[in-house]
């Protein structure tokens, strides 16, 4: 192996030496520096955008290797990115996978020996790619196309768009766009033209292109017209369409629905359609086409002419004319036939008719018939004519009738003729010659039965004789019997004979009768039937009938027929008991008979039971052994020969069988169930009757198939007797009576309220009678009866005491009545174990020592849970442990860390007690303060501001919890003594102590999320302490020098408190308050406020609470409860910061405050509430009113405890008994509740609960549900009104006291969305409700306290009662003291504000109130008319929240203006100076009471509106009419009320009695009507000048006091007033003067609406707020109530919606 390695090394060395020789020879060559001849390199993409192809030609021979390097170039021309390298010995190379359109740098290196390489650098660019998804489409306009595409891959510089015609290559558009442009719109193109779009992608000088072809849309053709050229052709015309290549014509046959299509070339504008159907409507559609586009133009409709009918033929018939023809080709709408000649007639026929008849008789003459064919607007006309001869017009006579007349005078005169006439018609009918000597004349072929006249004419034409006579009539045809409906009737009928007659005669005869035929009956010629009545049934008759005319009769026609037999009469069917048979009986019918046929049917189901033939003498028949309870029908008919009469029918029943096995059971206390078994046979129904003590109670009737029935609404626990009866028609059979009991009544629900070891059980009994029975309440423990107590029926409350906490028992109620007993479902009472008591936490640095007392009862263990509180409000679990002991050591804790400890007791029933939670903080390791800290700095000129510096007591001063300021006038002390901290300002000022504790405040340097201050300056001597002996920062003694020291306390409540002092400061002289500058005093006050806020925040944050161990005098005096007592005011501007601080750490500060309040007032006596006589009057046993504040009712005689009700007086903001808090009434205390309302003069009731929640009755329904009044004791309550909103309901009651005979109105406001033991969803809804309550209370100022209740009267009631004064305090003082408010509440009623969530919610409401800030002025500004409806809807949302907010702003604005006598800016100084001045002047003229003193106010209308003068008070005629004249009033409106004492005739002129004053004379002219409103026209004449003026007087409509007019009435009246004021030619309307003897709400409303309508009509805006404010500032107008303010908006909205404000001049 080694020789081989040595050989390889030698070979390598030899090759290296050879290369060195070559390189040495090259170094000496002349081409060394030049590098050899250059290369010729070419670069191309060869049509592929992602590759570059390099080729080169070497200038010198030799096979060299080549190295290639490729790098991309950026926009600046510099290489970047990864380079591609390649080696080759070829003369070309291709790079693949490049980015299209990108620039690249190429390096080609010739690798020569001895490192004599030659490198060529050049740049190149790949070819770009074409764009993707190129589209060219029409935009809907004939002159534009829109192109769109997706960008080309790779890089590009721009896109070039070339649009040209493909045939001529004429360029239409050439534009370049940036690569970011992906669409382009080409305009101004030729319609209907083909274009090619080329999109060229440029990348440097390289490009790639793609193209697309598209057409523009042609212009749609227009002015399409179609005209008919004949019966089978239509010609169309249209205007040429620009750009259209072809026109598509579609002709639609509107009758057949077929289409005819034709395509014509461009340039053609007309086309004729041939071979169409005559008389047919066609619709033509035209479409212009160019390329793929088709644009439809208008449509046109036209008819072809109808074709002519052929072969019109007129044919005369007897007495009429007949026409026929052949229809032409095609369609038609119909025919019109017009007959002209002696008779004119026009007839219209349908398109399918081909003949017509013109009825006669037609007179002879020449007739022409015109036949017109209709088709759309066109017609075709043909005519035909005919001559109608007289013979054709005369009616044809019946042949065979002969007229033979005698009495012809014989004469020898020749040439006589007999002329025949019809008596009824004037025409000549016959003319024959009469031979001389003839005595009769005969005519043949006449009408039978007709009346003729024959005139004998001489040869000279004279009538010598006239004869009349009749032809013989023909007999009636087809005589037959047509009806035998009744046994005593026959109806005959016949057909009239040809010819005429005057009547018919009919007679008849009974076969076998010896009497002559019956009466002859004459009938008229038009009668063809006769009914023969009162014939004998079952008899045969011969009937004869003939016709007669004049004295001639026809032959008689006879017919023989028989009447039917009569049915039997008085048929009856009844049941006979002895023997038990069903018996039928009847009476014989009149007429003939041979026998009776008797059939018996059973009706259900219909079955023939029996069929018998009885003799003609039979009158009854019986059936035995028929089934029971069935209904039978008997049919009896009479037989006579082969005839059978109609049957007589009747029904009857067999008696039913009684029900068997009757059984009665009680299914419910008020229900009995009766059942039975069906007996054999049938029945129609069952009747079950219920008796109680022999008195019928109820009856039930059921069907025959039923086998049971039930009775409801019975009396519980009662014995009843039941009678069951089977009915079959009128027959019945009863079963034996059965007795039964109803179950006794038991409560349908047991509701228990647990409290410690007792329970209050509400027993809910069903409504209705309680009935009878005995009940017991039973407690069971583990299945064994442990306690039993009798209950009275209906008892609704049960008190269970001395229950074992932590134990479970079951409660049931059992009741017995007779043999029955009932029981409720057991109610499991799981008694919650009591919480641990006397919890004490002793903190140390690394552990907490916890002690407690276990509650009594069945308890097992105590669960202790420990959580570490961290900043931000969260908590981390540490550990938990179960223990049966009463003490626990919690080790391994972190110093100066807060821990939340929760102790819960587990009862023997596995139920947990209420958790007792406390926060305990481990102490610091040890605080080692300096023996004496440096003296503090004192700021001069600020009332002695003492500055505490952070760190002045060492670096561990974070363990300091409290700082104190010690003041002294002793100039010799170096540091304070221990006794100084127990001396107060009172000891110093009045007892002569030289040193005292002036101020105590929490550590202000406690670490917080925000920055910690470096120092804290505290003003000293700023409070007015009076005689308080508590710690107080009182004024310093004037003229004394004071020194100050700082005291630091590590804790306040332990003997281990570490106390440190600073040295005293330099002495400073005190400053008298009188001598102190105002700015200094203000600064001091502000500083005090800041300190108070800071202390409050720190108190809330740290929540100090003392332990249970004994305390020395120092710690007792320094407890926060004692220090701050109950007053903890927070300025409104600091409330948000305080709220956020208290909310930190899971609301820890709120929790500690609430824990402090829990014990307040609990030790106060409640003896009256705990008295046994009053226990059942309390809804909950733990909510009992304190004796000192309870509301006492008037005691009823003989009832010593009737003065008790569960209610307390609560102080309000301005009165010690402003509010009454009470529980929701129980059923038995409703009367006491209304007594409370009446005796305490309550006018507003606030209800904060619903009647029932989650199945629990929270409050009894104590008011009427409808208009029917309800009486409780002496008080009757009427419901007057009820209005429901989303979150509350308003009601108004009228109370009537029967004994006192007095009435009073009370309003109830019920908040309906507040769950029990919870809070509303948002503070805004409750705040809006509070504002509503405040408005109602203001309206009833001084009329008694407000009554507030929920269910218990403490939780929701306490929250609401606390919110009322807190809101008032916030509005009046800009300060909130929630703690003190709740403290006072709990001193007057226990448990006020029941839960922590309610306490926090109270703060949330106040925070919302503060954050609302002042109302936006824009909300109450002018509103455009067009937006007014929207503004009304916005204000009405959320139960009128916007109106409430705006109204509060109005009241505040009115309050701000109170006392100011300055006139408004637009007041007219030349008119009535002011309302006060007017009162002063008029009071001199007429002395009247203050409330009736005259007052006048002017409301100017501006340059185009009318002025309005308002006069109030008892005005006489002189004052009224002279003011009318002075102010140029043209309209006078009187608002006098019916109860005013003024006499109308005193101020109004009468028709015959004008009013005359020193200035004017007033005449009554006439009564008129304006806009539907009655008015009086008055003429006023000025005495000196004689000038006249007409005044329109209108009377304001009357409505009840305190109510408003309906909007429609008021708006109609205002419209009438506006029209009166607008009369005349003046540009400015006449002045309106309104007079009212009293200041009323109606006056305010009228004045406001009158001005608002003027605004709307002239300015097109309205400003309700400003109008109401200006009017209220005037003396003549009252402040509107909230309801009136809303009424103004609604009334104005109605007016604008009805466009009432007409244009006014």
Swiss-Prot record:
<feature type="glycosylation site" description="N-linked (GlcNAc...) asparagine">
    <location>
        <position position="851"/>
    </location>
</feature>
<feature type="domain" description="Fibronectin type-III 3">
    <location>
        <begin position="218"/>
        <end position="305"/>
    </location>
</feature>
<feature type="glycosylation site" description="N-linked (GlcNAc...) asparagine">
    <location>
        <position position="299"/>
    </location>
</feature>
<protein>
    <recommendedName>
        <fullName>Receptor-type tyrosine-protein phosphatase V</fullName>
        <ecNumber>3.1.3.48</ecNumber>
    </recommendedName>
</protein>
<feature type="glycosylation site" description="N-linked (GlcNAc...) asparagine">
    <location>
        <position position="431"/>
    </location>
</feature>
<feature type="region of interest" description="Disordered">
    <location>
        <begin position="24"/>
        <end position="44"/>
    </location>
</feature>
<comment type="similarity">
    <text>Belongs to the protein-tyrosine phosphatase family. Receptor class 3 subfamily.</text>
</comment>
<keyword id="KW-0732">Signal</keyword>
<feature type="domain" description="Tyrosine-protein phosphatase 2">
    <location>
        <begin position="1427"/>
        <end position="1695"/>
    </location>
</feature>
<feature type="glycosylation site" description="N-linked (GlcNAc...) asparagine">
    <location>
        <position position="737"/>
    </location>
</feature>
<keyword id="KW-0904">Protein phosphatase</keyword>
<keyword id="KW-0812">Transmembrane</keyword>
<feature type="glycosylation site" description="N-linked (GlcNAc...) asparagine">
    <location>
        <position position="649"/>
    </location>
</feature>
<dbReference type="InterPro" id="IPR000242">
    <property type="entry name" value="PTP_cat"/>
</dbReference>
<feature type="binding site">
    <location>
        <position position="1316"/>
    </location>
    <ligand>
        <name>substrate</name>
    </ligand>
</feature>
<dbReference type="Pfam" id="PF00041">
    <property type="entry name" value="fn3"/>
</dbReference>
<feature type="domain" description="Fibronectin type-III 6">
    <location>
        <begin position="475"/>
        <end position="569"/>
    </location>
</feature>
<dbReference type="GO" id="GO:0048144">
    <property type="term" value="P:fibroblast proliferation"/>
</dbReference>
<dbReference type="InterPro" id="IPR029021">
    <property type="entry name" value="Prot-tyrosine_phosphatase-like"/>
</dbReference>
<dbReference type="InterPro" id="IPR036116">
    <property type="entry name" value="FN3_sf"/>
</dbReference>
<feature type="binding site">
    <location>
        <position position="1394"/>
    </location>
    <ligand>
        <name>substrate</name>
    </ligand>
</feature>
<dbReference type="Pfam" id="PF00102">
    <property type="entry name" value="Y_phosphatase"/>
</dbReference>
<feature type="glycosylation site" description="N-linked (GlcNAc...) asparagine">
    <location>
        <position position="239"/>
    </location>
</feature>
<dbReference type="InterPro" id="IPR050713">
    <property type="entry name" value="RTP_Phos/Ushers"/>
</dbReference>
<comment type="function">
    <text>Protein tyrosine phosphatase that acts as a regulator of energy metabolism by mediating dephosphorylation of insulin receptor (Insr). Prevents decarboxylation of osteocalcin (Bglap and Bglap2) via an indirect mechanism: dephosphorylation of insulin receptor prevents insulin signaling-dependent decarboxylation of osteocalcin, preventing the hormone activity of osteocalcin. May play a role in the maintenance of pluripotency.</text>
</comment>
<feature type="glycosylation site" description="N-linked (GlcNAc...) asparagine">
    <location>
        <position position="117"/>
    </location>
</feature>
<feature type="glycosylation site" description="N-linked (GlcNAc...) asparagine">
    <location>
        <position position="570"/>
    </location>
</feature>
<keyword id="KW-0677">Repeat</keyword>
<feature type="glycosylation site" description="N-linked (GlcNAc...) asparagine">
    <location>
        <position position="345"/>
    </location>
</feature>
<keyword id="KW-0378">Hydrolase</keyword>
<feature type="glycosylation site" description="N-linked (GlcNAc...) asparagine">
    <location>
        <position position="74"/>
    </location>
</feature>
<feature type="signal peptide">
    <location>
        <begin position="1"/>
        <end position="18"/>
    </location>
</feature>
<dbReference type="InterPro" id="IPR000387">
    <property type="entry name" value="Tyr_Pase_dom"/>
</dbReference>
<dbReference type="GO" id="GO:0032869">
    <property type="term" value="P:cellular response to insulin stimulus"/>
</dbReference>
<dbReference type="InterPro" id="IPR016130">
    <property type="entry name" value="Tyr_Pase_AS"/>
</dbReference>
<feature type="domain" description="Fibronectin type-III 2">
    <location>
        <begin position="130"/>
        <end position="222"/>
    </location>
</feature>
<dbReference type="GO" id="GO:0046676">
    <property type="term" value="P:negative regulation of insulin secretion"/>
</dbReference>
<keyword id="KW-0325">Glycoprotein</keyword>
<dbReference type="Pfam" id="PF18861">
    <property type="entry name" value="PTP_tm"/>
</dbReference>
<feature type="transmembrane region" description="Helical">
    <location>
        <begin position="1078"/>
        <end position="1100"/>
    </location>
</feature>
<feature type="glycosylation site" description="N-linked (GlcNAc...) asparagine">
    <location>
        <position position="882"/>
    </location>
</feature>
<keyword id="KW-1133">Transmembrane helix</keyword>
